[in-house]
């Protein structure tokens, strides 16, 4: 009985400890406690505490639940719900009981007990209303979207609630079906990082319109493309929803353009996307407060990214007079409205020396600052990239600057090779998985063309001809997803793959040749991460 009721036993007088130890069955022990409470000899909550311990003991002896092998989201088979007349008992089982421990109070509570699918540890926690709602959805196979509407929740909030319970282990869920080619990431490869093998989020970068209120000197596409009819736009949302459900990933839409806010029905499109439970973000230009407030009322933005191309004079030469100051005012507005903000810079030979001065000016004004190298296509063909050796020196300087400015992000994948060489932690690079072209990311243009990456011509289909699932699994998409053959043996390939857009603009074979700015050769024999 000492191993079955350790917490309860600690709270018993010595005479009752001996009686508990002498009990032949757990039922006899519980009866002893009930009698002691009735005679006012024991703390009144001890029988309920003992019943929790009994369930936890049974759970600990159960087989470890399956991890990511279920076909649908489901209850952890070891999960049990235990009604209790007392609140605060779980604290006594989870290492509480010190001088600061609050005495359990007489109030009904449901306690959840389960074995974690990953750690095999037994967890004992009081059930909140949201936790019970998530369990009900899984147990009864309910539609999360319908439940969200019935309970006055946003679908995304309910999706997050379900994912939270999956992370905690009270629910089990199928693994993401967005899996890297084993030549890129595999547990069999000692230099690979398994956490980059599966993508939990799929992003559709949707260029909803070509209309733009700027005319930037490095724009990669000024072609005229009409936006799709409303019914087709709704079909896109449904196709993305189906893709995410069947591939067991969270969907995200990053609206961009042009300027996405110039789409004639953008607010309605945003509302429809929210109703399907997607994470929503914007890559756009500064806008008015009222527009942001209206969007926030529908669903808080996951992020708003604007672009700056250097210090004020150079930026306004690229993006137009007054753009720099408008952008600074807009960043203040994003902070005021508590919208996550990001500034993106397109790096050229003209502004490379302005990146860090600009970052210092933005310190405290933006949540994240990143850059990508110029894709010299479209109007960007008139600009130039820096020389590779100059860029290599810059990358080292940039990484060192991150020590004083941790809001500097790594979006250019080749920075990870420098991180590796300088014993710094590598990051997910451009999309969280190195080059994510046609892996955890696709671009949809205003007229329905689907590209692996928007920064260079990489068409893999048309949304009017095929749905996203068909396009994603096409041979052409797989080619972009695999990337250059020269990269496959690289020590940082799981978080790199170079930049296909830069390579394509340089005229190299992107299926064979590595990024012309790459600093690495092939992986050396026996080299490990």
What residue ranges belong to the model's regions?
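Flexible mid-to-C-terminal extensions adjoining Fe-S/redox cofactors in radical SAM and related proteins
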Residues: 184-187, 454-529
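A glycine-rich beta-turn/hairpin centered on an aromatic-Pro dipeptide
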Residues: 54-100
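Cysteine-centered iron-sulfur cluster-binding motifs in ferredoxin-type domains/subunits
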Residues: 207-215, 438, 487-494
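Conserved alpha-helical substructure of the radical SAM core
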Residues: 182-294, 302
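Low-complexity, glycine/alanine/valine/leucine- and proline-rich hydrophobic stretches
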Residues: 80-136
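A broadly conserved sequence feature marking short terminus-proximal activation segments
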Residues: 162-188, 433, 438-469
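Long, charge-rich, low-complexity alpha-helical segments
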Residues: 1-68, 120-205
């Amino acid at each position: 009985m000492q191993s079955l009721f350790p917490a309860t036993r600690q709270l018993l007088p010595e005479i009752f400890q001996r009686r508990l130890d002498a009990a032949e069955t757990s039922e006899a022990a519980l009866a002893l406690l009930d009698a002691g409470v009735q005679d006012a000899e024991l703390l009144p909550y001890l029988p309920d505490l003992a019943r929790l311990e009994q369930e936890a003991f049974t759970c600990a002896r159960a087989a470890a639940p399956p991890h990511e092998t279920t076909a649908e989201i489901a209850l952890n088979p070891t999960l049990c719900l235990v009604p209790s007349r007392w609140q605060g008992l779980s604290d006594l089982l989870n290492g509480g009981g010190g001088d600061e421990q609050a005495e359990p109070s007489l109030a009904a509570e449901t306690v959840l007990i389960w074995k974690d699918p990953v750690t095999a540890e037994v967890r004992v926690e009081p059930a909140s209303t949201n936790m019970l709602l998530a369990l009900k959805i899984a147990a009864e196979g309910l539609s999360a979207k319908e439940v969200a509407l019935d309970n006055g929740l946003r679908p995304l909030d309910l999706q997050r609630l379900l994912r939270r319970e999956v992370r905690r282990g009270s629910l089990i869920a199928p693994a993401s079906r967005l899996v890297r080619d084993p030549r890129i990431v595999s547990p069999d490869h000692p230099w690979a990082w398994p956490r980059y093998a599966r993508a939990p989020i799929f992003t559709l970068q949707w260029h909803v319109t070509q209309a733009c209120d700027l005319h930037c000197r490095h724009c990669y596409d000024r072609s005229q493309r009409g936006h799709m009819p409303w019914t087709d736009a709704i079909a896109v949302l449904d196709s993305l929803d189906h893709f995410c459900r069947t591939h067991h990933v969270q969907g995200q839409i990053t609206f961009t353009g042009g300027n996405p806010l110039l789409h004639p029905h953008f607010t309605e499109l945003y509302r429809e996307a929210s109703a399907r439970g997607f994470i929503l973000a914007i890559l756009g230009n500064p806008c008015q407060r009222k527009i942001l407030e209206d969007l926030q009322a529908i669903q808080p933005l996951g992020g708003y990214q604007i672009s700056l191309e250097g210090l004020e004079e150079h930026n306004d030469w690229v993006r137009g007079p007054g753009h720099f100051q408008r952008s600074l005012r807009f960043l203040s507005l994003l902070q005021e409205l508590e919208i996550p903000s990001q500034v993106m810079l397109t790096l050229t030979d003209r502004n490379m020396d302005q990146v860090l001065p600009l970052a210092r000016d933005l310190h405290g004004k933006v949540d994240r600052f990143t850059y990508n190298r110029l894709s010299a296509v479209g109007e960007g063909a008139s600009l130039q990239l820096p020389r590779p050796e100059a860029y290599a020196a810059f990358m080292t300087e940039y990484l060192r600057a991150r020590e004083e400015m941790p809001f500097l992000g790594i979006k250019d994948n080749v920075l990870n090779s420098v991180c590796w060489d300088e014993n710094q932690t590598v990051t997910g690079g451009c999309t969280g998985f190195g080059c994510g072209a046609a892996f955890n990311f696709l671009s949809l243009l205003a007229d329905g063309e689907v590209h692996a990456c928007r920064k260079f011509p990489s068409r893999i289909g048309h949304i009017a001809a095929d749905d996203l699932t068909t396009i994603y699994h096409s041979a052409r998409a797989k080619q972009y997803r695999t990337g250059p053959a020269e990269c496959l043996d690289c020590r940082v390939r799981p978080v790199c793959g170079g930049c296909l857009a830069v390579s394509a603009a340089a005229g190299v074979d992107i299926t064979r040749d590595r990024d012309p700015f790459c600093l690495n050769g092939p992986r050396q024999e026996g080299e490990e991460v």
